[in-house]
Amino acid sequence: MFSLLGHAVNYGSHRTRRSFSRIKEVLKLPNLTDVQTQSYKWFLNEGIREMFDDIMPISDFSGKLSLEFVDYKLLKPKYTLEEARDHDANYSAPLHVTLKLTNHETGEIKTQDVFFGEFPLMTDSGTFVINGAERIIVSQLVRSPGVYYHSDFDKNGRQIFGATVIPNRGAWLEYETDAKDLAYVRIDRTRKLPLTVLIRALGFGSDSEVADMFGESDSLRFTLEKDIHKNPADSRVAEALKDIYERLRPGEPKTTDSSRSLLYARFFDPRRYDLAPVGRYKINKKLSLKNRLLRQTLAETLADPDTGEIIAKKGDVVTHEILDKLSPYLDRDDFKMVTYEPSKEGVLPDPVTVQEIKVYSKVDPERVIKLMSNGHIADDVKHLTPADVLASINYFFNLQDNIGTTDDIDHLGNRRIRRVGELLQNQFRIGLARMERVVRERMSIQDISTVTPQQLINIRPVVASVKEFFGSSQLSQFMDQNNPLGELTHKRRMSALGPGGLSRDRAGYEVRDVHYTHYGRLCPIETPEGPNIGLINSLATYAIVNKYGFIETPYRRVSWDTHKVTDKIDYLTADVEDNYIIAGANAPLNEDGSFKDKIVLARHKEDNLEVTPDKIDYMDVIPKQVVSVTSACIPFLENDDSNRALMGANHQRQAVPLINPHAPIVGTGMEYRAAHDSGDALVAKAPGVVEYVDANEIRIRRDDDTLDKYVLEKFRRSNATKNYNQTPAVKQGERVVADEVIADGPAMENGELALGQNPIIAFLTWNMYNYEDAVMISERMVKDDVYTSIHIEDYESEARDTKLGPEEITREIPNVGEDALKDLDEEGIVRIGAEVQDGDILVGKVTPKGVTELSAEERLLHAIFGEKAREVRDTSLRVPHGGGGIVQNVQVFTREAGDELPPGVNKMVRVYIVQKRKIQVGDKMSGRHGNKGTIALVCPEEDMPYLPDGRPVDICLNPMGVPSRMNIGQVLELHLGIAAKQLGIHVATPVFDGASEDDMWNMVREAGIGKDGKTVLYDGRTGEPFHNRVSVGIMYYLKLTHMVDDKIHARSIGPYSLVTQQPLGGKAQFGGQRFGEMEVWALEAYGAAYTLQEILTYKSDDVVGRVKAYEAIVKGERIPKPGVPESFRVLVKELQSLGLDIKVLDMDHKEIELRDMDDDSNDHFNIDTLSKLAEQQEKKKLAEEAAKKDDKSAEPVDQSDSSTSSDDKVSK
């Protein structure tokens, strides 16, 4: 019966899985981090040179000096990777550039090596170490440079057209028509001009010349009629140039020369305008005649220019066959080429050569129109040419005759990837351009005879731009280092945000939506929930990025004559794929590669078709090429609703590495490659035999008898404060092959990804403890450390120089008992291995206080002992709330030891504290199908429901969580898991090609489990069986990084905001819980006036009141009445700042003087005694008047009222 279990597949040398896949793997997965590493390699080998060649040579304004680039080299890094991490430094290498300075007057040449700053290096796994932390440069998905056409309908239902020429760097050029069919142009987003103005500015002044060039077009005719010039052609060209200058530089004096040079600089100057190789490729492709000729009726006969043989006659409709015959001729430089001579007044005086073919209009079959291409412009011409402009305008007019196609902006043929190499190059170019200006200025200032390249170069702008990019760019991100899968996904992430991209506020629904071109290129499932949904995507498993930045996906070629599927692989971009019909990978094949079925399900563009095998051009390589690595790790993905699959993919990245992880019993076969390529596993460089193994190192004797030594990472803190630890996966004497995993990283077992555990799970409601997705777990999970994880946090203390003297790290701390110092060494630093709790001292530190006026006693002491009592305050580093644990490591950095420290810092101490966190109530857990929940109860093992053989289940999940969520994959995984466990095997069920329902039931039957997959379950408390049979099985379950220890928080006495004097918010600030508007309504509704009053005063921002209340509580007295909240004063001050005269009135509309409004001490103002205060002031006035009238000394007024009693002297 073992034949039911699929076929055995080895993943590494330590794991065999039974795979249910039926489709043979014809293509190996590419390396999953290549998208990062290959791009950076290109940058180091070619990108840097390309950039220097673009910027140099730099000449001075007189042309006497020129600075040229010769070569560059990267030297050895200053720090190793480990040293860079420890010292909070960058892992970078010095860049040295050889420059040649030529003096053209004397012919003297000076060559010199110039240091160009430290350049960050990429690690082997595709990350950068910046300031000691690992960072990743996320690839960016942007609109490709090129020319794009679109159409729309105006309010009257008329079709209007538009076109945009988008460069990589430079001004945009836009064409548009309006409701009257007039054609306009916008240059660099300015106000529109008639399109004919641009054509005239290129040097084609007369109307007949323009009409002749573009053929008959209504839109052109109407525009010419509107743009009437009575002047001769040449002066019209000058007028057009001035019109454009007026638009671009309004208000400035215009001359023909300045207008000409401005337009030239905007579009035709290679230094100012850059299409990049990809823009040139896209423009040549779009404007080529091949794309427009198909199905057009020719208005002229086409013949071979050499032999005169007729290829197609006038009146012929161009079919695929005719187009195939024409194609080689269209690529020639002597076929249907037409040259136009522009006026000398135009932007560029050179003749313009284009390729033209005449056809009949589809709208009016009598009318002849021209199809024009830009000729054959070389791939290295990265600026626009007049031929590009004319051909793009011609295409624009052709669209109005139903010739040509509009473009879909969200099509992946029009969106490209900017990878790390290109992003770095762009940033470096910005720095070099700034440096170029400095060099030019210095050339004109310095003495020509003595100047050297070193004196001309200022590397500060270059260093600053690179530093800014790595430090603060939106695309330079702190690496997600929760687990290897999170790391790998981060490296393969594609973001549409960032400089030059979209912003999440302006991104509409269309940009975020799944597009048919995502198939095999971007994962349709994995994307964040929330405001970034659809803007951040993940590269599909088999996708690669080509040299132009377009994503390609592999397909198996179908032979065009035999119609059999071959093993030849073609990588296709999205726009090339649009030309073919492609069958799915699940289409059944015969042994010889022919299709079994007469009708095959296939795709063409966005349509799903049923076609005969002879129509098919390509076939998918494997079903999982559609999804990303994380989605490909979800078994039975095809049985989950996509929203839940999205959550499942995201939850896997949040799994915490456990102490003793296990790979899933039900896997997908993706686990080995994900772990291998993540960069966290240690991999053998060459084949050999393991000679020595311990926890810290592995030694392998190669076949050529050389010895390789591999050092393992031990208990390092990861970016996500998790424990990064490697453990050997091989034994002494074992033979290894090259590229095999020899040591597991975090969350790995036997070279496979192991994000969680395989507990026994029952779908059972239990005393309402799993209400609303809550999870009930067995105490065994806690006792046996099944879900225990290790967390490492680091804390730093710096001793700085202050104005009053240097801070000191010491054991002698004022007003601290000996018991608080028990774990500190003689220097005042905590010992390794000490167990510390919240508030314990880690590093003793004192800071000088300002010298105060000495008291008589201190003066006496000073006179006797001759030294001033040291005035210092305790600024020791203490364990923050929830940070207790065991001190794992202490690092001390001092200048004496040769460590680089920031200015003003004399000594720095870093303490690592390790916590062992067991699973507990409040922790979040999840499966791989988006079935998440928090733990509501840790139930004693003896009370858990148990199986007929006495085994208690480990976890109880609510069965109500399955039907409405439609993630049935978890139920299938549950049954298959228990069957595999009973049979003692691991299984692989790849996505879209895994175990069918029949396979699963066959395996369940073979394992001897009931045919419904359910079992009788007994109540652990009573021993009675539950009424119904219950689904019990094994499902992979993860502990997520959202742990209650990091979230739980209660404020006692804490900090207040400076302006409003209200408590801060959030755990990090030790803040309070906001009692918001709706909570106030609730208390108002209950009529709880006193509770409400104290919440709005003492507990919030009544500064005096809270102090008095505190004093009263300490002394055991009655709590005084509250006073004025600080926010009321802030409101008054803000209104006063607007120039409003604010008066506070009592209930009788009498004014109260808020003298304390200006008084910093914020004292005697009581909102409850407003009328009382008014009375006091009235009495005072009367008393003063009486005193004036009476010559005798006035009778003393009773003062007891005006100096309010301590009860009244409160705050709000």
UniProtKB/Swiss-Prot annotation:
GO molecular function, one term: ribonucleoside binding
Reactions listed under catalytic activity: RNA(n) + a ribonucleoside 5'-triphosphate = RNA(n+1) + diphosphate
Biological processes per GO annotation: DNA-templated transcription
GO cellular component: DNA-directed RNA polymerase complex
Keyword Transcription tagged: yes
EC number(s) on file: 2.7.7.6
Domain of life of the source: Bacteria
Biased composition (Basic and acidic residues): 1176-1195
Gene3D superfamilies to which the protein is assigned, alphabetical: 2.40.50.100, 2.40.50.150, 3.90.1100.10, DNA-directed RNA polymerase, beta subunit, external 1 domain, DNA-directed RNA polymerase, subunit 2, domain 6, RNA polymerase alpha subunit dimerisation domain, RNA polymerase Rpb2, domain 2
Record region (Disordered): 1176-1212
PROSITE patterns associated with the record: RNA_POL_BETA
Keywords of the record: DNA-directed RNA polymerase, Nucleotidyltransferase, Transcription, Transferase
InterPro entries: DNA-dir_RNA_pol_bsu_ext_1_sf (IPR042107), DNA-dir_RNA_pol_bsu_external_1 (IPR019462), DNA-dir_RNA_pol_su2 (IPR015712), DNA-dir_RNAP_su2_dom (IPR007120), DNA-dir_RNAP_su2_hyb_sf (IPR037033), RNA_pol_bsu_bac (IPR010243), RNA_pol_bsu_CS (IPR007121), RNA_pol_bsu_protrusion (IPR007644)
CDD domains per the UniProt record, alphabetical: RNA_pol_B_RPB2
Function: DNA-dependent RNA polymerase catalyzes the transcription of DNA into RNA using the four ribonucleoside triphosphates as substrates.
HAMAP family xrefs: RNApol_bact_RpoB
UniProt similarity note: Belongs to the RNA polymerase beta chain family.
Quaternary organization: The RNAP catalytic core consists of 2 alpha, 1 beta, 1 beta' and 1 omega subunit. When a sigma factor is associated with the core the holoenzyme is formed, which can initiate transcription.
NCBIfam families assigned: PRK00405.1, rpoB
This protein's name: DNA-directed RNA polymerase subunit beta
Originating gene: rpoB
